[in-house]
């Protein structure tokens, strides 16, 4: 009985974990129209973004704000537009995921 309760608690806690972003979410949110995992398109490759921000403790927050509000000047002349279809939580998930791309 104790094992059943432990298993039930473990399963219940999994349902409260945040959904992790991945390439599918990036595709659905139109990020892949300008970015790719490993090559520059209109915007930088995600692996290059991850390398640039590696080791910066506030990198996920910075990138999440760029996803939400857009930005310019970091990667060249073409500005990144704001992304209004992305929620704040999704922006943070996407930014955290981008930082893991190798």
Give short role names for the model-derived ranges.
Residues 20-37:
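Sequence/structural segment immediately N-terminal to covalent heme-attachment motifs in c-type
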Residues 24, 61, 88-92:
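Residues in well-ordered alpha-helical elements
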Residues 97-101:
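C-terminal alpha-helix
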Residues 1-22, 102:
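N-terminal export/targeting leaders of redox proteins
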Residues 33, 42-53, 66-95:
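Axial heme c-ligation environment in periplasmic c-type cytochrome domains
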Residues 52-62:
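Short microdomains enriched in Cys/His and/or Lys/Arg
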């Amino acid at each position: 009985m104790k094992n059943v309760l432990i298993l039930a608690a473990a399963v219940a806690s999994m349902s409260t974990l945040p959904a992790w972003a991945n390439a599918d979410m990036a595709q659905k949110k139109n990020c892949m129209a300008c970015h790719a995992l490993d090559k520059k398109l209109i915007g930088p490759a995600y692996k290059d973004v991850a390398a640039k921000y590696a080791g910066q403790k506030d990198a996920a927050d910075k990138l999440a704000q760029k996803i939400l509000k857009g930005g310019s000047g970091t990667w060249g002349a073409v500005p990144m537009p704001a992304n209004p279809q992305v929620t704040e939580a999704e922006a943070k998930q996407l930014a955290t995921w981008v930082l893991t791309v190798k």
